[in-house]
Amino acid sequence: MNLALNLLHKRGFLKQCTSLKVLSDLMDREKIVFYAGVDATSSSLHIGHLIPFLAMMHLRQHGHIPIVLIGDSTTKIGDPSGKSEMRKILSLEEISNNAFSIKNQLQRITKFSSKCFIHNSNWLDNLNYIEFLRDIGIHFSVNRMLSFETYKKRLDFGLSFIEFNYQLLQSYDYYMLNKIRNCRLQIGGDDQWGNIISGIDLIRKKAGVETFGLTFPLITRSDGKKMGKSEKGAVYLDSSLYSIYDFYQYFRNTSDSDVKTFLYLFTFLEEDEIELISNFKGNSLNKAKEILAFEITKIVHGEAEALKVQEASFAAFRGSGDRSNIPFFKFSFSNLEEEVLLINLMLDSKIVPSKSEGRRLIDSGGVYINGKRVENQNHCLTRKDFNNNEIELRVGKKKFLRIVL
């Protein structure tokens, strides 16, 4: 197998691939152009979206030529893949702003040049519908489209005609990228398999060119939960939506059974180093988790920020060091207040989702103020509790928050 493909396989990226042997031989002979697409449905991607772009970075290191397709036009329709209901229709301004943000985010993470980024509005916005149906639609079988899981699952919930067109447009994207950039490979999540296959078929019928598709497994944690979800919601790559400290802690709290898998997927460490540190036992495995958290934080937010939150994490858990990057909640006593009920402060700061959960944690001995266990549900804080205008609140073993006046 080609070196780059073999690397993707070893690191757990490879789920399905069309004509793997032919693609491998082609990549041995020449450096190919390949692409992954992303729609502008949000102002930020989350960690679950990152897999294709990490794979792109690996392929780029082997000399292959990446294209990131920003689907600003296809966002107007919405991809039905993996969805049980129609996506919210966004305004043109929202889509434009999201596309701008996502491009900047991915350019910062991947370090790809601007010429690697293309918007599909370049060709989709000016399509003539009648001509598109005649020249492109004729090559699609409705029966075959309905056989793909993307549409089969949605038929039970309702599938709009606008969404039914999505596969044609994504296929046309691949066709256009092959035409203008000689793109030979599309990569994406395994839920995109049907769309990718349709694009390959369209190019073969329209241009007589063999192209390829490669998909990645949809990443889940060992507890069965989808990768990229936390108690605070999606683990966004934008620090204004999900703090860098919380991002680091999300990976620092990886379960033991996921450490090796995530080191292969979310870092660029060499195989022998991953094998060494992922085989640590007991408390030593925490070192592997710290390495994992640091490496992926460095990729997404840069080394300087990764060092800051690593130091803050060490300070929180080991009791020494720079604590300034531990997340904080700004609080002020009202003029009439002499004290504040801790349970209310816990809810306001969102360190607990409800008062009942806060009471349960206090009763179980899981809440600490400045390292001292809170014994009473009705515990109150006064100004005197705030040394240097702050206190440190710990909930459970892993949640730390500075309350700052």
From Swiss-Prot:
Q: Where is the S4 RNA-binding domain?
A: 340-404
Function, in words: Catalyzes the attachment of tyrosine to tRNA(Tyr) in a two-step reaction: tyrosine is first activated by ATP to form Tyr-AMP and then transferred to the acceptor end of tRNA(Tyr).
Fetch the InterPro entries from UniProt. Answer: aa-tRNA-synth_Ic, Rossmann-like_a/b/a_fold, S4_RNA-bd, S4_RNA-bd_sf, SYY-like_C, Tyr-tRNA-ligase, Tyr-tRNA-ligase_bac-type, Tyr-tRNA-ligase_bac_1
PROSITE patterns xref list = S4
Reaction catalysis annotation: tRNA(Tyr) + L-tyrosine + ATP = L-tyrosyl-tRNA(Tyr) + AMP + diphosphate + H(+)
Q: Where is this motif: 'HIGH' region?
A: 40-49
**Which gene carries the instructions for this protein?**
tyrS
Its subunit composition reads: Homodimer.
Domain of life according to the entry: Bacteria
The similarity annotation says:
Belongs to the class-I aminoacyl-tRNA synthetase family. TyrS type 1 subfamily.
Q: What is its EC number?
A: 6.1.1.1
Q: Chief subcellular site? A: cytoplasm
Could you tell me one molecular function GO term of this UniProt entry? tyrosine-tRNA ligase activity
GO BP term (any one): tyrosyl-tRNA aminoacylation
Q: Which organism is it from?
A: Borreliella afzelii (strain PKo)
GO CC list:
cytosol
Task: Please indicate the residue ranges that the annotation assigns to the motif 'KMSKS' region.
Answer: 226-230
What subcellular locations does the record give?
Cytoplasm
Q: Which UniProt keywords apply?
A: Aminoacyl-tRNA synthetase, ATP-binding, Cytoplasm, Ligase, Nucleotide-binding, Protein biosynthesis, RNA-binding
Query: By its UniProt entry, which NCBIfam families does this protein fall under?
Result: tyrS
Query: Which HAMAP family does UniProt cross-reference here?
Result: Tyr_tRNA_synth_type1 (MF_02006)
Q: Where does ATP bind?
A: K229
Q: Which residues bind L-tyrosine?
A: Y35, Y166, Q170
Task: Please give the name of this protein.
Answer: Tyrosine--tRNA ligase
